[in-house]
Amino acid sequence: MARNAYFILLSCLIVLSPSQGQEAEEDLPSARISCPEGSNAYSSYCYYFTEDRLTWADADLFCQNMNSGYLVSVLSQAEGNFVASLIKESGTTDANVWTGLHDPKRNRRWHWSSGSLFLYKSWATGSPNSSNRGYCVSLTSNTGYKKWKDDNCDAQYSFVCKFKG
């Protein structure tokens, strides 16, 4: 008799355990990042677009002072599409928007100001342009803000900051 009761109890535990575990997993809140008002979340980062027009260096400094961020690094096509949508949804008419990509030693070796590896590339046709000698990179409106061109770092453009959420 005790053996039968043990078997029934064990059977019930085996049958109930998977469904109880599934309920527990479904009840867990999903990990979400919290971004300050005016910024938008993508992946584990917050993105802030401003139409304030600054030089590349001043824009990067602005981003560093804002939640320890940097000018935006675009590390994939998906992220580039998100950034382009963010800019377009603002309604801006700006032709160029700064990114964090630059050539600090002026030797045509590009680096993200955030220190991220420069692996993904989305240059506009004809860029980078060796005769232009631009050492900073902007997104261009004529490509829907999806392609990059090298530009004069002293030009004053709007920009996107990226920081951890």
Curated annotation (Swiss-Prot):
Residues 1-21 form the signal peptide. Might act as an inhibitor of spontaneous calcium carbonate precipitation. Residues 33-163 form the C-type lectin domain. GO terms for biological process: cellular response to chemokine; cellular response to gastrin; gene expression; liver regeneration; midgut development; negative regulation of cell population proliferation; pancreas regeneration; phosphatidylinositol 3-kinase/protein kinase B signal transduction. The modification Pyrrolidone carboxylic acid is found at residue 22. Glycans are attached at residue 129. One of its GO terms (molecular function) is carbohydrate binding. This is Lithostathine-1. It comes from Mus musculus. PROSITE patterns: C_TYPE_LECTIN_1, C_TYPE_LECTIN_2. GO terms for cellular component: basal part of cell; collagen-containing extracellular matrix; dendrite membrane; extracellular space; growth cone; neuronal cell body membrane; perinuclear region of cytoplasm; protein-containing complex. It is found in: Secreted. Disulfide bonds join 35-46, 63-161, 136-153. The gene is Reg1. Expressed only in regenerating islets and normal exocrine pancreas, but not in normal pancreatic islets. Expressed strongly in pancreas, moderately in gall bladder, and weakly in liver. SMART domains: CLECT. Keywords: Disulfide bond, Glycoprotein, Lectin, Pyrrolidone carboxylic acid, Secreted, Signal.
